[in-house]
């Protein structure tokens, strides 16, 4: 069984399409083994506000932000019908194998292995890539609130969607975190960036292997 690791960005929690996305994931999980990695969302934004207000160490902010992912994960687990929270790959495999979505609460696992730099350059994008590498996944899906990666700021009228790119082009692209390229080189999996405000695109990708979005070729 090959797990698809799918990160649901925290930005999804600010849009009314989140329930429809969760319903689509619950349905897709019946046919495709899914491990959902949560973003941080409003929970991580609270950590950022604390870091702006107080002299938090990089390590404190790092672990607080990962605990924020656990919180968002519990929210997603409550909204994805039949899903279960998990804290390791060993817990995820049997749940996904039963046609239910496994939702990772990553703090305990990451705390035990501490595999990534303690920096705001590392977000849930890179964490999801690390998880995909550990799972031996063929595909990582980053669900965001834009159609994919662009050659300029998405709000710019001249911005063009990048349909396909090499992982070497990721550094400097503002749509993902700065550490993602390194994490993907180590994970060696195909990556897609898709818009979760259109749940049908996520379903199409899982079913057919392609949709509107950006495909990042594995390094």
Which residues fall in each region the model found?
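C-terminal catalytic "cap/lid" subdomain
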Residues: 1-219
């Amino acid at each position: 069984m090959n797990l698809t690791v799918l990160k649901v960005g925290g930005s999804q929690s600010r849009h009314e399409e989140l329930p429809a996305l969760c319903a689509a994931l619950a349905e897709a999980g019946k046919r495709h083994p899914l491990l959902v990695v949560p973003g941080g969302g409003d929970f991580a934004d609270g950590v950022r506000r604390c870091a702006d207000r107080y002299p938090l160490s990089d390590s404190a902010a790092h672990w607080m932000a990962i605990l924020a992912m656990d919180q968002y994960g519990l929210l997603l687990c409550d909204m994805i019908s039949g899903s279960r929270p998990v804290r390791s790959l060993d817990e995820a495999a049997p749940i996904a194998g039963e046609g239910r979505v496994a939702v990772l609460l990553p703090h305990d696992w990451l705390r035990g292995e501490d595999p990534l730099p303690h920096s705001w350059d590392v977000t849930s994008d890179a964490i999801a890539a690390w998880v995909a590498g550990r799972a031996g996944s063929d595909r990582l899906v980053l669900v965001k609130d834009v159609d994919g990666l662009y050659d300029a700021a998405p709000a710019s009228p001249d911005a063009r969607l990048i349909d396909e790119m090499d992982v070497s082009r990721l550094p400097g692209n503002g749509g993902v975190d700065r550490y993602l390229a390194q994490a993907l080189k180590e994970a060696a999996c195909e990556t897609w960036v898709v818009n979760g405000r259109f749940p049908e695109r996520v379903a199409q990708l899982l079913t057919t292997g392609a949709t509107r979005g950006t495909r990042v070729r594995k390094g």
